[in-house]
Amino acid sequence: KEGYLVNHSTGCKYECFKLGDNDYCLRECRQGYGKGAGGYCYAFGCWCTHLYEQAVVWPLPKKTCNA
């Protein structure tokens, strides 16, 4: 599974500005989904890869980003 890393309290994607390989996104994806996850910056959001099927990614149901 793949998807955008989401902040569960705000419903927003994690923003990033250095597109492609991005240490911040990789670190945040691994922290949120486990050390087997990958991550990079895609369309100014942290995109996480190699997630388990039940992983919760953006958008959250019934929660829109209100940042």
Swiss-Prot record:
Expressed by the venom gland. It is found in: Secreted. GO terms for biological process: defense response. It comes from the Eukaryota. Coiled coil: none annotated. One of its GO terms (molecular function) is sodium channel inhibitor activity. GO terms for cellular component: extracellular region. Residues 1-66 form the LCN-type CS-alpha/beta domain. Disulfide bonds join 12-65, 16-41, 25-46, 29-48. Keywords: Disulfide bond, Ion channel impairing toxin, Neurotoxin, Secreted, Toxin, Voltage-gated sodium channel impairing toxin. InterPro entries: LCN-type_CS_alpha_beta_dom (IPR044062), Scorpion_toxin-like (IPR003614), Scorpion_toxin-like_sf (IPR036574), Scorpion_toxinL (IPR018218). PROSITE patterns: LCN_CSAB. Its main location: secreted. Has the structural arrangement of an alpha-helix connected to antiparallel beta-sheets by disulfide bonds (CS-alpha/beta). Beta toxins bind at site-4 of sodium channels and shift the voltage of activation toward more negative potentials thereby affecting sodium channel activation and promoting spontaneous and repetitive firing. This toxin is active against mammals and lethal to mice. Selectively modulates Nav1.4/SCN4A, a sodium channel present in both denervated and innervated skeletal muscle. Belongs to the long (4 C-C) scorpion toxin superfamily. Sodium channel inhibitor family. Beta subfamily. Is neutralized by the single-chain antibody fragment 10FG2. This is Beta-mammal toxin CeII9. It comes from Centruroides elegans (Bark scorpion). The lineage of its organism: Eukaryota, Metazoa, Ecdysozoa, Arthropoda, Chelicerata.
